[in-house]
Structure formats: structure tokens, C-alpha cells
Amino acid sequence: MTTEAITPLRQRMIEDMKARKLCAGTQRGHILSCKRFAAFLKRSPDTATLEDIRRFQLHLAETDVSICNRNRIMTGLRFLFRVTLRRLDLAEEVYHIREPQKLPPVMSVDEIKRLLAVASSLKTRVLLSLGYGCGLRASEIVRLKVKHIDRAQNIIRIEQSKGRKDRNVMLSDEMLGLLRQWWKTRPSRYDAGIPLQERWLFPSRKSAGRPMTTRQLNRLFHEAAEAAGIKKGVTPHTLRHSFATHLLEQDTNLRKIQLLLGHEKLETTARYLHVATGMISAVESPLDRLARPKHKRPRKAEKNRKEVQPPA
């Protein structure tokens, strides 16, 4: 935590975000976006003009800022102008750039096997298995509690995930077995005194009563990927992409995959159709059909003669 004084403008913006129940990560992102704009202006953002916004957007375009990060900054500024300052004229000047539609990276089944085989510990293997076996986001994995594991119904409950939505995912026998192994060896000294159902599956070793961080999960994932010889750019989220893609290649209904991933729109899930290489490679090319020898079809007259039966 910093000791930086909170200005009245920032305090009002924080209150506006809390009133709309924006998650903590979104709030931090919006504040950082406005701080960046203020640093560019060298004065408070509530004094900004249309020309200031135009110059700032040109500045971002000329610097090494990705389209994704640039759009995040614009989202924060739009909230400031539209909600906190009620300056709709300035909010309209803030625009987003369409991001290139890139295919999500996916690991092959063989790469997944290698990744899990070289996991340096049972904890790492369980963490990675939750990503691939259940399609969970990194933030969902680290925030799992005992109460979320429903052995009676063979499901894992994901509470208040992205978009503040709850959902259920499958709990396979293999995954349940791994979780049982982990629970037997999991250190309990980090959450002594906490009711059993409220205990984190992966507690922090540094902060009592807190879960491990996504940064720690990311480090464990990359250590395993390097040991497995996986060179392409992958992250823990690649496990989720691979989960969806491999289910599609097993002919799992797209609607079911949408529910498991927690996507609001089916179109979001449908993008995995573009990376399901097993489905794509199974489609016969029309070029192959051209190369196949044609079977000679009998002429109509001959066919008719064959069909005529001799008189009894």
C-alpha cells in the first residue's frame, strides 16, 4: 500500500465504481488509466478538453502500447468522463480500436501429457489439471475453497467469477483423486482456526488466511512448460483454451462447452471451432476428390436393359 494522498476526484471515482459493484481489478485498472492520463496532461483530468483527449490518443498510438492495453486505458477514461464527471461530450471523444481477431494458442494432447508428467510437485500437477481438466481460469483455480468441491454431484462450483457469474464444472474421478491426494499432503498451518469449508485449497504461505496468487501459479506453469520442452508462447490460460478445443474434437456439443466455460455468448465459444485442428484436418479437401479415380457409371440404355426381366 502507498501513502499517496487520495484526491477528491479519485475518491469520488472510487465511490462511483463501488456503487456499480465493479470488481477490485477493474477499479485498479480504471484508476491507473486516469493516473496515466493525468501524468500526460501534467494536471488534473477534470480540467481536460477535447483537444487534450485527442492528443493523448495520438500519444498512445505513437508509443509501444498494445491495442488491448490502449482500449483498457480508454475504458477507464470513459468511466471517468461519463460517470464521475458527467462530461458526455468528452466521453464521446474516447473511442476504442478494433482488436485483430487472433486464434487462441492451444496445446496438443501430447503436450498436455508431457506438461503434467514433468510437474515438479503434486501441488503443481493438481493446479495444472484443474486448468486443463475443468477449463478454469487462473483466478478461479487459486480461489477454490473446500466448500466448492461437491462430491455428491461430481461438480465444482465456481462462485462470482468473471462478470460476477456463478457456474458449475465437472468433477471427474481422476480430478477428485488428485484433489484427495493433495488434501492429505496440503499444509494446514497456514489456515489454522479457519472453518474447514472456508479453507482455501491452495493457501498462501506468506499471507495467513489468503489464497496463493495467480503470479505464483503462472511461475509454476512456466517452469513445467520449460521442463516439458514446450517452446510456443503459452500461459495458464492456454490450458482453458486446450480444454475447450479438445472437447470440441471429441464432438462435445458447443452449448455444453459454453456452459462449462461460463461464456455469456455462444459466439465467444464458437471461436474454438477455428482452432480444433482435429476437426479441421478430418474434413476432406475438394482437391482430394478431384484426384480420386471416377467410377464409370453405366449408360442409361444399358441400365434399362439390365432391369428388363425376360418373359417367363
Label for each model-derived stretch:
Residues 1-312:
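Conserved catalytic core of the tyrosine transesterase superfamily
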